[in-house]
Amino acid sequence: MNPGRTSARNASLFLLLALLSFAAWSDSAATAAGEAIFRQGVLPTGEPLQGMRGSEAGLEGAAAACFNCHRRSGLGASEGRIVIPPITGKYLYRPDRSKPEDLDFRYVQGYRLNREPYPDDASVARAIREGIGKDGRELNYLMPRFDLDDASMASLLAYLRGLSKEVAPGVTADTLHFATIITPDADPVKRQAMLAVLERFFADKNDFIRGGAKPIQSSREIVYRVTRRWQLHVWDLAGAPETWGAQLKKRLAEEPVFAVISGLGGRTWEPVHRFCQDEAVPCLFPNVDLPVVEETDFYPMYFSKGVWLEVELIAARLDEQKRQAGLRRVVQVFREDDIGEAAATALNRWAEDAGLQTVRRVVRGPGGSPLAAAVGDLHAGDALVLWLHKADVALLPAKAPDNAVVYLSGLMGGLESTPLPAAWRPVTHMAHPVDLPEQRRFRMNFPLGWLKVKQLPVTAERVQADTYLVCGILSEALGDMLDSFLRDYLEERLEDMLSRRVITGYYPRLGLGRGQRFASKGSYMVRFADPTGTRLLAEGDWTIP
């Protein structure tokens, strides 16, 4: 063996590896720079992106970011009569429509089969800088003209080439994989009720497509056919919340899923929320009364802010009471290690900022004695706020406070079925972040009728109705997507279609604007009409705090 030749060969190999590593790093850096332009409106220099629309005032920074119109997926949208086309590399540079390789293009909003492809990077750059299309005609005035140097343009085009390029994990030729996540402290009755709805809905979907129709092969097919089975994976968590993230990442690696549907939580959902956002997995409308309020997060979606919405509603009432009736002190009662503690902490912050005295009384131990002590010793000018579940509401003393206004969490207490003692009913105002029973009755005919037909007992009505609702929402959104199974696109379709739904279950209306992640935004404040029964009286209109 020639040592000199071996050394030269090793040096050449080292140089090749170094060059490949540098090329990969360079491509990655360019893509990251392009992403910053696309999503944030920030140039590689750190300066804000500049865009102009004719004689109008210019756009700058985040307001000029491409995703504002073309969406996070880059697949475009439709705004009234304005069609915003997809701008991912797949659609910008697509093969000629007359060639066989064009047959596997999937339908997305804004995509026209007769749209000519851009022949090269220079033509795309001209459209971005000058607003001149590939046919030489001026683009719609809504398309800004962007001031990008060559390096910035190259980074943006590199990002667009890779954007929404691959089908998402959890999608195979014949199956869509979904997970539902259940925390270890979740109510077992609600768990069984939720899973029964999910399993039956999935079975119905799969029965509908039984027979083995093949996946769509061409966007030229006239009729859309649902062809993929739905596979449900149940991810039961164990142990302390700080271990849930690692458990979920392990499950996702073992069982890749397209999205997480429904789910059931207890005292905290924070680790699940963080997992969904960090792993870019849509997590759709779990059954949790203490969701995570991070409006800038993209992937988790919720029906309501839950008890956080109740905090806002009660705070508004307390503010009114302070101005009109001399409120001086807010006394809050909650059970140890329950979601009421977080709600009480949030309301405490508001009360202290408002200059009110605050008292927190923690219920510990079984029986009615600890609770009776917690709701005693009240004075004129006090407001008593109860963050209690049904079992504790039932243990309230028979005699209500004589000299305090009482507020109750409806979500925790059980809404109209809360076992509030008769003497408490006239003096208690209950936050009610769902529609009134008589007003939701017609809409509830759909989920309740489905449960009856499927011979599923009603054991946790709100959980079952919300689970049925999210199944229907997901089915409708996937129908709109055809074969474009991309996670970001799923979120965007949900934003666009949710406000059009007639079947909204417990909620008077649902809707998600761009970037919004709570579909129902309002609440009633109610009181009971009678010493017994479930009839409620609204103390005003549906209110969005």
Q: Where are the model-predicted features located?
A:
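Segments of small-molecule ligand-sensing domains
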Residues: 450-465, 475-537
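Beta-alpha junction/loop-to-helix N-cap segments that form part of ligand/metal-binding clefts
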Residues: 173-175, 189-196, 208-295, 364-368, ...
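Gly/Gly-Pro-rich "capping" loops immediately C-terminal to redox-active cysteine motifs
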Residues: 51-121, 142-148
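Extracytoplasmic ligand/sensor domains, especially the bilobed periplasmic-binding protein
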Residues: 254-361, 404-430
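Extracellular/periplasmic periplasmic-binding protein-like sensory domains
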Residues: 300-304, 397-469, 539-544
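Detector for the c-type heme attachment site
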Residues: 39-42, 68-75, 92, 129-133, ...
